[in-house]
């Protein structure tokens, strides 16, 4: 469980031209303790997109106990993903972009790096920012009455002027926070969490009170009950997909661990306790306001707006946006910047790559991706189809194929060298990734094929299982073939 000594190799790898951001962390640069890992996601779990996701569960027919079970099961799965996929990072001090090379090859790692850093990172940044911008509309309308009536008739690719202005403001805040550096981010994560919890818990208590207490909330029954347990599994998978990005690139955080137990204790402790509280506050706020005010489609922003006190509404929405911003910075801009730096070190720094991600996140017109529950779950299916297979391959590669041991010299290679795989590509891993992605996503386009449709609805979990099984079988088959070939050669000799 110890940490490898990479100090001797550091200068050698640095001489090859690798940027400081992607070199293995030496003991001097490992500055995160258990408390940092406990708090890193504590505020981020309370973000508007997560509340929208859980609101969708009630629309799909889940009862209050079923929603709470879905949240708790998702927390356990995400925590396990953090610990397992973060193990190599804390042991060797390397981040996601370089860890990928051990599984996919020096050049083959480009495929999953682009999936996580560019495609998914861009989409996630855009969607979370536009959701935050919509809540900013409510905030600004409270502060500046008539804000939503500015420039009537304005339409920019489907975006009205007030929302566009709110989007730009939140975009600048998010990117500016990231450009402040890791120390600023660490302080932000550490001190924003208590603020978020104070106001979220307060709002939940208010909602439970106006609904008449816990009794009516737990007795609440959806208008249309859940069709079958596959819907429940799909809901769990949607929540896991929401955290699929951090699961994939958790090594970017665990590489900074002062000691091995810091992330192994801190990440599960922070995620599980935070998610249990998230489940309670989310259910209390959504169901409480539904009972008291009949909020349509469990709209969380509309629910908060029912508080009546303008100051309370503003502060609570700001608190939720702090959580969303924390997630976007740590879960999207940071990994996207690191991946692009690893792919094109002469063209990008972490900060310039993150700015590109933020710009592209706007170019994709994210406001068209979150215009309803169906669109949101299609989004989860898409990103889960990428995150799940990547996670499965990485876990099998490190724990089964490599037995938790890495050769950093085959990862940090000299310019022009390909490492341990022919032409720098692990064809088996890349092939399994593509096949798993196609199988997992195909149900979204073939809804009349029940098996594929159900696989797609649980994209992250399905993709991870499919890729794990396929890659493990491929490894066992290749290993058996190699042994047979050696035995045949020995007999001939």
Locations of the language-model features?
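Membrane-interface "cap" regions at the ends of multi-pass membrane proteins
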Residues: 1-64, 76, 201, 225-236, ...
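Hydrophobic, membrane-embedded alpha-helices of multi-pass small-molecule transporters
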Residues: 34-51, 166-173, 207-211, 221-285, ...
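Selective recognition of specific alpha-helical transmembrane segments in multi-pass small-molecule
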Residues: 47-50, 73-81, 116-128, 195-209, ...
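Transmembrane alpha-helical segments of multi-pass small-molecule transport proteins
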Residues: 113-114, 140-179, 195-204, 231-250, ...
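Hydrophobic alpha-helical segments and their helix-loop junctions in multi-pass secondary transporters
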Residues: 129, 133-142, 195-221, 239-243, ...
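Membrane-interface loop-to-helix entry segments
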Residues: 130-133, 165-209, 267-271, 379-388, ...
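C-terminal membrane-solvent junction of multi-pass transporters and transport-like membrane proteins
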Residues: 390-473, 477, 484-488
């Amino acid at each position: 469980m110890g940490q490898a000594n990479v100090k001797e190799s550091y200068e050698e790898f640095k001489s090859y031209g690798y940027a400081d951001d992607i070199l293995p962390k030496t003991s001097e640069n490992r500055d995160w303790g258990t408390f940092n890992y406990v708090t890193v996601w504590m505020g981020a779990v309370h973000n508007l997109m997560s509340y929208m996701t859980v609101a969708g569960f009630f629309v799909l027919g889940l009862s209050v106990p079923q929603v709470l079970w879905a949240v708790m099961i998702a927390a356990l799965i995400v925590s396990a993903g953090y610990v397992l996929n973060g193990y190599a990072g804390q042991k060797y001090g390397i981040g996601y972009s370089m860890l990928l090379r051990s599984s996919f090859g020096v050049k083959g790692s480009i495929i999953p790096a682009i999936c996580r850093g560019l495609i998914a990172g861009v989409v996630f940044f855009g969607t979370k920012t536009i959701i935050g911008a919509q809540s900013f509309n409510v905030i600004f309308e409270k502060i500046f009455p008539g804000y939503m009536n500015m420039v009537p008739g304005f339409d920019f690719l489907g975006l009205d002027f007030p929302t566009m202005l709110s989007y730009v403001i939140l975009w600048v805040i998010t990117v500016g926070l990231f450009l402040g550096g890791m120390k600023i981010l660490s302080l932000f994560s550490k001190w924003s969490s208590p603020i978020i919890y104070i106001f979220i818990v307060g709002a939940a208590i208010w909602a439970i009170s106006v609904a008449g207490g816990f009794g009516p909330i737990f007795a609440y029954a959806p208008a249309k009950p859940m069709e079958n347990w596959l819907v429940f599994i799909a809901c769990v998978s949607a929540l896991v997909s929401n955290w699929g990005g951090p699961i994939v690139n958790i090594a970017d955080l665990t590489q900074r661990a002062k000691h091995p137990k810091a992330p192994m204790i801190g990440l599960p402790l922070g995620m599980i306790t935070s998610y249990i509280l998230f489940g309670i506050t989310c259910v209390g706020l959504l169901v409480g306001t539904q009972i008291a005010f009949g909020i349509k489609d469990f709209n969380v922003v509309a629910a908060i707006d029912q508080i009546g006190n303008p100051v309370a509404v503003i502060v609570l929405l700001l608190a939720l946006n702090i959580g969303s911003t924390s997630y976007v910075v740590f879960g999207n801009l940071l990994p996207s910047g690191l991946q692009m730096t690893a792919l094109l070190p002469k063209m990008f720094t972490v900060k310039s790559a993150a700015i590109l991600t933020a710009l592209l996140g706007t170019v994709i017109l994210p406001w068209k991706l979150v215009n309803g529950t169906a669109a949101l779950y299609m989004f989860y299916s898409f990103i889960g189809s990428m995150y799940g297979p990547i996670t499965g391959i990485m876990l099998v590669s490190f724990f089964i194929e490599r037995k938790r041991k890495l050769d950093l010299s085959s990862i940090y290679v000299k310019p022009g060298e390909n490492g341990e795989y022919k032409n720098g590509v692990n064809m088996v891993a890349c092939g399994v990734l593509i096949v798993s992605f196609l199988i997992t996503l195909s149900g979204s386009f073939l809804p009349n094929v029940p098996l594929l449709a159900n696989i797609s609805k649980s994209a992250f979990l399905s993709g991870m299982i499919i890729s794990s099984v396929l890659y493990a079988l491929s490894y066992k088959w290749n290993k058996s073939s190699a042994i047979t070939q050696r035995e045949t050669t020995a007999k001939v000799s």
